[in-house]
Amino acid sequence: MTEAQHQGDWADRMEQAVLDSAIERAPALGWNGRLVRAACEAQGLSRGDEELLLPNGARDLAALLWRRHDDQAMAALADIDPATLKIRERIARGVEARLEAAAVDGEAEKRVAGFMALPTNADLALTLTWATADRLWRWAGDSATDWNHYSKRAILSGILVPAMTLRLFDGKAAADAFVAARIENVMSFEKWKAGKDFDAPMTRITDLLARLRYGARA
């Protein structure tokens, strides 16, 4: 093992250890710099170590928790064959798995939700939610590469955030009902959209750009 690999393994292990300490302390301290320092101290890390491990402080720690829950959700979905489910069932199961992963660390996740709601963290919240939506759609079998790739992830991102809030603060039944209603809304829209050539404007733009770049076809 090279020195770089050893350092990388240490960093990965220590990130998870610090995250465990943070989850334990978040209900009392909130999600902030104080929490980061306390969690790092619990693992015997100096301020210098903390700055190396989590240069963006509480933002990095929030991202670690979010991605842990993503990984846990995907592990829970690993034994499910999405091909045996209708598309709406795939999305419902995927969202449910992600919400339940977060609910395990409910009190800490509530602090993260408040932290992510701050205007200064909007970019982080958007990036992480989009990544979650992408992983869920890929599990569901989505292979779109056109503008539908982006619209699907944008729509699912818009479902995930309020559903997460409902799961944490109002419980599973409220979250499940919300998700079911939103999926029904989306499916109704897709049925209405079917047969209408909404791709035409995008196709014309693509053709125009191709002509500008490569010239008119002979």
Cite the ranges covered by each PLM segment.
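Hydrophobic alpha-helical connector segments
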Residues: 12, 76-111
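C-terminal peripheral helix-coil segments that are non-catalytic and often amphipathic
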Residues: 2, 169-218
